[in-house]
Amino acid sequence: MARFGQHGTIAGNEHAHRATREVFMGTLRDILATRHGIDITEQQEQILFDDLHAIMEINKTMNLTRILSEEDGMVLHLEDSVLGLPYVNDAPVGLYGDLGTGGGFPGIPLCVLTGRETLLVDSVKKKVRALEPVAEELGLGDRLSTYGGRIEDLALERPREFSVLTARALSSLGSLLELASPLLRKGGRLVCYKAQPTEEELEIAFGIMKPLGFELVCDDSHELSDGSTRRIFVFQKAANPRIALPRRVGMAQRNPLMPVDFAQKSGQKSKKRR
């Protein structure tokens, strides 16, 4: 499998890739099964390693990821990405989007394992364009596409089209809730991968989730095989947001919504009713 062209993916270093894959084949499956209770096939594992190798090769000429070795990538990209599989599978049937996909993680692995129609989203167009030939060579071209642009613009173009979204190391939970709300249909889910969110971040997110139309489905902690901790938060779209979304591009990060914003709006409405 896997022959790429001049951007220097798998074809440029096939011997090294085969050697690395021979060393690690089976290891990822064992880790996922024993540590996380997730089963994948040998063929799926091979596709995931081909994906990782392709991204590592592209990364030599384009900054897709800060992780520079396939050994580290097996844990910090593949194992980490696949942690989201049960949560994505629990979401309603339909379109899956990976927000801020970067090097295609967790989007490509979850496309491989779920079989869902998938959209990889990143504001840097050249990043998602670099992922397109990778997807083709992995046999995902019929169900995986890319969007190079801002999430707010995507929400205007494709409102309420998504059944499930993922976001890994992209922004604060509160900002992610705001960005995801206009994209998700009712009943859709947002799966957020976080390392160690602060109490302040959690307080803000939990304080604005209901006004944005969400309810918390789960907050799970996982330990990766390198000893690091990953928390996965899953929010379900239960209602329409109380405010018009999306706001202008960048507002979710530059001027994030706070619980007090909605308390003030409720107070203003109460005064008007009185």
What are these regions (language model features)?
Residues 82-169, 177-178:
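Conserved SAM/SAH cofactor-binding pocket of Class I
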Residues 175-189:
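A short glycine-rich, Lys/Arg-flanked "PGG" loop and its adjoining helix->strand segment in the class I
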Residues 127-129, 198, 202:
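Short alpha-helix immediately C-terminal to the canonical SAM-binding loop
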Residues 2-8, 13-97, 126-142:
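Class I SAM-dependent transferase core
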Residues 172, 195-199, 223:
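Short "lid" loop at the C-terminus of a central beta-strand within the Rossmann-like core
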Residues 205-274:
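SAM/dcSAM-binding transferase cores
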Residues 187-197:
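Conserved beta-strand signature within the Rossmann-like core of class I S-adenosyl-L-methionine
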Residues 68, 147-149, 218-220:
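Short loop/edge segments at beta-strand edges and connector loops
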